[in-house]
């Protein structure tokens, strides 16, 4: 009889232990589920950064992102049609890739404009089955033109088209890419370069991208070349369209870092060190072409672009071990506002912990301790001066990209910036690093703020900067078929 009682008691204890484990797990699983279709303006929770509270869902009468559009009238100065296709294509170096093209090539065609030009792009989806969009990475366009599926528009279905119109705001090096299933479509080749500037004799555009493990410059593996006469001041516009930081630089002559993320560097000096270019970031390198030429190196000497007079063989070799540090490069200059008088002070703490995301077990990214979609929505009003501290204890680096704005770096790991104002739209935040940035909220809308290692964004490392009173008629997931990451 005692044995029977002991067995019963043992079963009850085992059942209790099992329930004690399964019930919390079931709760965590259930609360991790992302709604089949949701409004991105209503996800997460409102973070007002110490400023006045605003109704997270409906403040005042509300303004739709559709109202925040580019010019509806006027003859465009730049008028192009871009056609997206899912297809097999050949790289410039001959390898066959099964991916995505724009007008039959990848990278897609260069879009060139001048400051103040009205740009009109008619985007046609010929055969990208999941739909596609065009996002203008680094160009602070009006919100409706931002090209984010489910936030500022619906993804363009096969057979559909969408027209983007915006004024080219500032000279610089930028790029366009799909922001629908971007972790797949950008990787597969749905992107291209944009330059806002008049063409110059020494200009070289170098878009770096990895296709199926093959890293390329302008779609070419190995060594390419660009003919530029000796004595010409060359401006090499480098675009990192991959998901990880890459060291780049010129060898064969000293060079200057003259622009970062489409913003001029004040007082650039000659360097020979490599430049660490974040995923999604751009850098303009300037040098006078020597008689023997020079070479852009991307990562290692296995991928390079010789730049020099026809017939010259530019010097080869790897980049030096030291790197340009923008925290102290160049000379100070006014930034146009006072970060010490911030209206909002935000924290963006990036971490990682085990759990469930949309019912899937794993090790997931967190923002301020919360997993997507229960992440902070950074709430601002137009005209606010905003400070944000971005810290990273996740174990991996993250290239953080804020849409619609450029921010200035104030400090890294508590050390104040002393060089040129370091303006960014894409900032590499390494593990155990902390950056302070500041910007003016001067472009109303609903703006993504996410990691541009795009698989990380698809795993939940994304949120939004949300302006008072702005709503969106678009939805993400479910029957909307919008999946921005």
Q: Where are each of the predicted segments found?
A:
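Beta-strand signatures of extracellular beta-sandwich domains
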Residues: 133-137, 247-249, 399-401
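Primarily extracytoplasmic ectodomains and periplasmic/lumenal surface modules that are beta-strand-rich
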Residues: 87-91, 117-120, 127-131, 174, ...
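Active/binding-pocket-proximal capping segment
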Residues: 253-261, 368, 393-422, 454-458, ...
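Extracellular/periplasmic metallocenter environments
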Residues: 126-128, 141, 150-203, 243, ...
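Divalent metal-coordination and catalytic microenvironments
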Residues: 82, 121, 134, 178, ...
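Histidine- and aromatic-rich segments of cupredoxin/plastocyanin-like copper-binding domains
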Residues: 2-3, 145-148, 154-157, 167, ...
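N-terminal, post-signal-peptide metal-ligating segments of extracellular/periplasmic oxidoreductases
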Residues: 2-161, 196-234, 333-386, 468-469, ...
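Flexible loop/turn segments at secondary-structure boundaries
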Residues: 214, 244-246, 256, 266, ...
């Amino acid at each position: 009889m005692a044995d029977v009682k002991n067995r019963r008691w043992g079963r009850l204890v085992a059942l209790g232990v099992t329930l004690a484990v399964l019930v919390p797990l079931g709760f965590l699983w259930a609360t991790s589920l992302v709604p089949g279709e949701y409004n991105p303006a209503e996800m997460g929770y409102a973070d007002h950064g110490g400023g006045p509270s605003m109704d997270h869902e409906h403040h005042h009468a509300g303004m739709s992102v559709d109202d925040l559009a580019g010019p509806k009238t006027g003859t465009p100065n730049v008028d192009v049609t871009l056609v997206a296709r899912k297809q097999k294509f050949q790289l410039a170096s001959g390898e066959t890739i099964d991916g995505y093209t724009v007008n039959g090539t990848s990278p897609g065609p260069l879009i060139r404009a001048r400051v103040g030009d009205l740009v009109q792009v008619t985007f046609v989806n010929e055969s990208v089955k999941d739909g596609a969009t065009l996002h203008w990475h680094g160009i602070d366009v009006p919100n409706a033109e931002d090209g984010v599926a489910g936030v500022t528009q619906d993804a363009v279905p096969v057979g559909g088209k969408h027209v983007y119109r915006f004024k080219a705001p500032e000279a610089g090096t930028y790029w366009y890419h799909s922001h629908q299933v971007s972790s797949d479509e950008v990787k597969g080749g749905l992107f291209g370069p944009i330059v806002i500037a008049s063409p110059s004799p020494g200009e070289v555009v170098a878009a770096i991208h990895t296709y199926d493990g093959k890293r390329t410059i302008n779609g070419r593996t190995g060594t390419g070349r660009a003919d530029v006469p000796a004595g010409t001041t060359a401006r090499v516009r480098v675009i990192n369209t991959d998901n990880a930081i890459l060291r780049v630089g010129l060898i064969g002559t000293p060079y200057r870092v003259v622009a970062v993320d489409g913003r001029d560097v004040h007082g650039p000096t000659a360097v020979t060190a490599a430049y660490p270019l974040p995923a999604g970031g751009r850098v303009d390198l300037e040098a006078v072409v020597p008689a023997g030429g020079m070479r852009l190196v991307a990562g290692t000497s296995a991928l390079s672009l010789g730049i020099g007079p026809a017939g010259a063989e530019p010097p080869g070799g790897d980049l030096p071990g030291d790197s340009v540090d923008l925290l102290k490069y160049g000379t100070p200059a006014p930034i146009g506002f006072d970060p010490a008088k911030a209206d909002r002070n935000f924290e963006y703490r990036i971490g990682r912990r085990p759990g469930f995301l949309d019912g899937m077990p794993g090790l997931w990214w967190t923002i301020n301790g919360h997993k997507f979609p229960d992440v902070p929505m950074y709430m601002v009003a137009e005209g606010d001066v905003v400070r944000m501290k971005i810290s990273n204890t996740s174990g991996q680096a993250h290239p953080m990209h804020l849409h619609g704005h450029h921010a200035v770096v104030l400090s890294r790991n508590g050390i104040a910036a002393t060089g040129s104002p370091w303006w960014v739209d894409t900032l590499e935040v390494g593990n155990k690093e902390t950056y302070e940035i500041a910007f003016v909220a001067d472009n109303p809308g609903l703006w993504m703020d996410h990691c541009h290692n795009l698989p990380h964004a698809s795993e939940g490392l994304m949120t939004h900067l949300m302006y008072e009173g702005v709503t969106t008629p678009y939805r993400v997931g479910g029957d909307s078929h919008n999946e921005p990451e």
